[in-house]
Amino acid sequence: MSSLTNQDAINSIDIDVGGTFTDFVLTLDGERHIAKCPTTPHDLSIGFLNAVEAGGDKVGLSVEELLPRIDIIRYSTTVALNRLLQRQGPRIGLLTTEGHEDAILIGRGAQWTDGQRVAERRNIAVQNKPLPLIERDLILGVRERIDSSGSVVRPLDEEDVRTKLRMLMDRGARAIVVSLLWSFMNPAHEKRVREIIREEYKEYHIGFVPVVMSHSVVSKIGEYERTMTAVLDAYLQRSMQNDIGATWDKLRAKGYHGAFLMIHNSGGSADIFKTPASRTFNGGPVAGLMGSAYFANKLGYKNVVAGDVGGTSFDVALVVESSVRNYTFRPVIDKWMVNVTMMQTISVGSGGGSIAKVDRSGTRLEVGPRSAGSMPGPVCYDLGGTEPTVTDADVVLGYINPDTYYGGRMPLNKAKAEKAIREKIAQPLGIETIEAAALIRYIVDENMASAIKREVHMRGYHPEDFVLFAFGGAGPTHMAGLKGDIPKAVVFPAAPVFCAMGSSIMDIVHMYEQSRRMVFMEPGTEKFVVDYEHFNQTVDTMIERARQELRSEGLEVDDASFGLELDMLYGGQVNLKRMSSPLLHIRTAEDALKVYQAFETEFSEAFSPLVVNKPGGVFLDNFVLRVTVPTWKPPIPEYPLQGTDPSAAFLGKRKAYWPETKHWADTPTYQFELLQAGNVIDGPAIVEAELTTIVVPPRQRLSIDTHGLAILEAIDPAPPTKRVSAAAAAIV
């Protein structure tokens, strides 16, 4: 795999499996080619190979001719979430410390609302806690105890372990999770339990079971979250092995022998068969976020809102100072809080497939969060769908051309879309069909714009300081409505498959976390009292583990860069801030000061300088080692300006309805692929691309820059609103 890190161009395939479409990006001989296929939920490997076939068609190669030329495949998938939602996992047994058998059943107070939609949270009185993934009779305690310092308080009773293990096996357990108190401080007991399981049920026994140790999955504090992370990994391990194994077998049968990497929600990629299931959740949106950060840096945009409008959801995240700074430390997967640090993206149930309906009162229109998916899909797909969606509204409004949708490979039935909107929306509300379609579009745009406003304002930023990267199949179609106060929106030629394109520039990244609580700055005195030896020993242990894993994957250790991130907080506060340490080791008070200053700067940006609390001291909670092995990245193309006239891309005119004027208009239509750098189009206009449509409303202007990107801006921008300081906004 070391060949992937050299500076020579590599050929790659990047695939992102979404709820509605499977996106494909092929980088071959330095050029990019994109394709899109419907997702096949019953067997994701079918959609995977369909996408590869569609990509091969772009370069005139069959799958068997294309795959042997590929060096690397990167994959982001929803397979883990699909299996979890369908509860397709084995019966799991849990061995935990005696007296703590009910910890994951009790959960945390927030578990009543974890994973619930806003409407469900408002009606919490009728909500039930989620059914556990492990039955109560398959959770047994063993006699042992390690304290918070890692010292053995009660030795492990090995005979008790053997007895409890046999009980679990007799009750039908087909996978074992071992999660003991404070095992991340001292994993000796967990390791010995695994040895006992292997002694009792050897690899060649029919009763052999996989074993997941919590300290191996998450070496961090948090009993409930650490245990649930291990449980999810054990629950999904076998089904993911089968699904991904089936895809791998098909790839090898068709001649592929390169690297197969999985996109991680931590912002990198790693060997697919060495990836914990919990690291695959939300991989697609994270790839889009990383792609946004990369292109923001290359194009000179400091602050970017990454907005991904797919068929099922709208994912939004921020790039600040050309980098990703926001993480979620205890994300909720389905209904369970886990202890996996993910790059933070916010998801709302708004997308091209979002279903519109009139509520029970008959007076209010709702759009989302339910989605029609790819099967049966929107009504206009003519595949049996009966409920109108956002895509149906876009077709009725005249924005999407039914004859050229999906590159002309999926003709749309406009008449059925009109009928569904008329009968299900317009008639119940007592309005015209076209008004109903415009209302559907308005509501979904406002839902997405509100998500952006919340994310920007709640972090103390000003929308006018940002640029919107609009991507996903429906992103360019709706960007004018969702950008709000953001002055500029950018559309990439690969916008419909941007998450897959984002993964094409992702490095190989391994992350290692270790909880070690230390006093960094003494309360009251503001003196640095961090234990240098303990600090450096923790870092060195993680570095050595990283080097061993890099060698085992065939990667050159000399190619890797090591970065340290620290989870720190002020005394008397509860909010941890993950900061990038300027140093790997601390050897002097001057080193400690440099680390603290970096923490104070990032803390102030995140929470406001008004809540910096040096007298309360500073505490270090967790170490994170980020190991990056860079991969080759294709250059961003640059074209000479060709003038403002877009007539070479003109396709003709077609009627479209514009709510801004409340009239139909013969609207100029252009072909995106034929536009040249420097071309300018004033709205109203429609720009068709192979896999998406750019809508340019009245009083908006679309221009093509020197990189072939489409830039949407207001012709007469509104005067800027009165600003409040970022600090004040953060407090509000």
Swiss-Prot record:
Q: Which GO terms describe its molecular function?
A: 5-oxoprolinase (ATP-hydrolyzing) activity; ATP binding; ligase activity
Could you tell me what reaction this enzyme catalyses?
acetophenone + hydrogencarbonate + 2 ATP + H2O = 3-oxo-3-phenylpropanoate + 2 ADP + 2 phosphate + 2 H(+)
- GO terms for cellular component: cytosol
State the EC number(s): 6.4.1.8
For whether the record's keyword set contains Cytoplasm, the answer is yes
Instruction: Give the signal sequence positions.
Output: none
Q: How is its activity regulated?
A: Inhibited by zinc ions, carbamoylphosphate and beta,gamma-imido-ATP.
Give the source's domain of life in one word: Bacteria
Extract the Pfam families matched here.
Hydant_A_C, Hydant_A_N, Hydantoinase_A
Compartments reported by the entry: Cytoplasm
Q: How does it assemble?
A: Acetophenone carboxylase consists of five subunits; a heterooctameric subcomplex of two alpha (Apc1), two beta (Apc2), two gamma (Apc3) and two delta (Apc4) subunits assembles with the epsilon (Apc5) subunit in an unknown stoichiometry.
Q: What is the recorded name of this protein?
A: Acetophenone carboxylase gamma subunit
Please name the source species: Aromatoleum aromaticum (strain DSM 19018 / LMG 30748 / EbN1) (Azoarcus sp. (strain EbN1))
Q: What is the lineage of its organism?
A: Bacteria, Pseudomonadati, Pseudomonadota, Betaproteobacteria, Rhodocyclales
